[in-house]
Amino acid sequence: KHHIASDIGCHLFSIMPPFELGATTMGYGLGPASASAFNSPDAKRRSISFVGDGGFWHNGLTSSIGNAVFNRNDGVIVVVDNFYSAATGGQDILSSRADNRSKSTRHPITEAIKGMGVTWVRHIERTYDVGQMRAALKEALTTEEKGPKVIVASSECMLNRQRREAPLKKQAAAEGRRMVKTKFGVDEDVCTGDHA
């Protein structure tokens, strides 16, 4: 098994059933830092750690990415990039893709990571493409390249997307324009009852 570590954030829910993925949790931006002890040269498997984009900018760039480079850690770091600091309410951050009149946004996480000295960086633009995510993780876990392997996994936070689109849909409906409302449900022929 791989040691899996997270910081606090929505991705931390993976430690709960039915997935139960995770061994350690540390503060905002510190998932990769908490995995550093498991990245020794004699480790049989690479650790996997998660940090959200809010935590990445808050503390993770220096405490997690910078230290992984400095200590030549050989683990896999996944930056969950949902375009906002979703864990604290959806505020814009440096890498937010929204136009913000009073803040500077649209600074790519990948560029900051490369600027810290990470050479193995992959960016998945649509994390709902499970095959692409799986392939990136497999490559990160099996590559011969030493040093930290960082995957930036980008997809917009669905809560913030709903908040962003709701007023636009309301206005369009008020103007008499036709609107499509996406609905989700459970396919009882496929569902295993695991609440995933």
Can you annotate each of these PLM segments?
Residues 127-136, 165-196:
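Ferredoxin-like iron-sulfur electron-transfer modules
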